[in-house]
Regions:
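Catalytic center-proximal scaffold of phosphoryl-transfer enzymes
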Residues: 1-347
Length: 347
């Protein structure tokens, strides 16, 4: 903003810092609405989204920015946390807390105490539009513990997401952060391999073992790329057998063996593409999209007002989406501000 003010003054425009700030962040409702529609439509028509997050300080406090997107749209939202509750809130087109039989099954799987599940089930299907209504309902059901409230809220938000028409088969591709592990979750192979790349062998045998395993991982990756292009039952069997054989390998390097054990624990998410060939094998797109946001954050620093933070998220989302569709962001802004309506809604 200071750089923009300096440039405007060099052009002969007499403007104060306060006036520029108001021009940038006030009365931007139409842009906020278009950003909201981006997400709603993107989630409705997409087979998958990729996600990531980064730090985004606000008013001197730590905060986070969550990214959702794919090759068709980009959406940024800054909040105070990066929990699974926060991610589900970001995914929802509108806030809803819904309890259904499917949600109760999710809660049981997540380890919510049977007594809490029974009480919630006895209340039947519920649908709340505000956090206050949901908290009152939890209190009435005797769900008071911190973890119990968190798990129940996750389930209710997931139920609200599905109730708004988002498919339970929506693919979520991430770097492995647990808050993103919902619906049909796929893991980034580039991130998974970094664990092995960071290992340091203490002798020549250990170094050779590490390099061999890394080579095998990238061979599997190449086979998965081939499978995405032309799925076949035969290649699927080869990949699954190769994955199992690699993870069962005992090497001379104990840290490497431990890494292989964790790698095997993520088998379902790493091999998700065998069920859903349209899913990407890496999360590079989300990292690339969020990198521009990080650059802006480094230049401008933290946000000071809530409306300023909201505007930064909105215009970052709209600008990145314009680029994905080959639309000049300046032409887009001129079209919207002048009301010519030559550029259709980005959604």
């Amino acid at each position: 903003q200071p750089l923009l003010l300096e440039q405007l003054r060099e052009l002969g425009i007499d403007l104060s810092a306060g006036q520029l700030n108001r021009l940038l962040i006030e009365d931007q409702h139409a842009f906020h609405m278009e950003k909201a529609q981006l997400k709603a439509t993107g989630l409705e028509v997409s087979a998958y989204v990729q996600t990531d997050d980064t730090g985004a300080r606000h008013q001197g406090n730590n905060g986070y920015c969550t990214y959702l997107g794919n090759e068709h749209f980009a959406w940024f939202e800054s909040t105070a946390s990066k929990s699974r509750i926060n991610f589900l809130e970001c995914l929802q087109p509108a806030r809803r807390y819904v309890i259904t039989a499917a949600v109760l099954a999710y809660l049981a799987e997540r380890g919510l105490a049977a007594c809490h599940c029974q009480v919630l089930a006895a209340r039947g299907t519920v649908d709340f539009a505000t956090e206050l209504q949901w908290q009152v309902h939890l209190s009435a059901c005797g769900v008071l513990g911190q973890r119990a409230v968190a798990v129940a809220t996750e389930g209710a938000l997931l139920g609200g997401l599905l109730a708004q028409g988002i498919s339970e088969q929506l693919g979520i591709v991430s770097d492995g952060a647990q808050q993103f592990a919902i619906l049909v979750h796929g893991l980034c192979w580039v991130h998974a391999e970094r664990t092995f790349a960071q290992l340091i062998g203490l002798n020549e045998n250990e170094r050779r073992a590490i390099e061999w395993v890394r080579g095998q991982i990238w061979d599997l990756y190449d086979e998965l790329k081939a499978y995405r292009g032309e799925p076949s039952a035969a290649l699927k069997a080869v990949i699954e057998a190769g994955f199992e054989a690699l993870c069962a390998t005992e090497t001379v390097c104990e840290p490497l063996n431990a890494a292989l054990h964790h790698f095997h624990a993520d088998k379902a998410d790493l091999l998700r593409v065998l069920e859903r060939p349209e899913l990407p094998l890496h999360n590079n797109l989300s990292e690339s999209d969020i990198r521009e946001y990080v650059k802006k954050r480094k230049i401008s620093g933290s946000t000071r007002s809530d409306e300023g933070r909201r505007c930064r998220d909105t215009f970052a989302s709209l600008k990145k989406t314009c680029r994905k569709h080959g639309v000049s962001f300046w032409r887009y802004l001129k079209d919207r501000l002048c009301g010519t309506a030559l550029i259709p809604p980005l959604a």
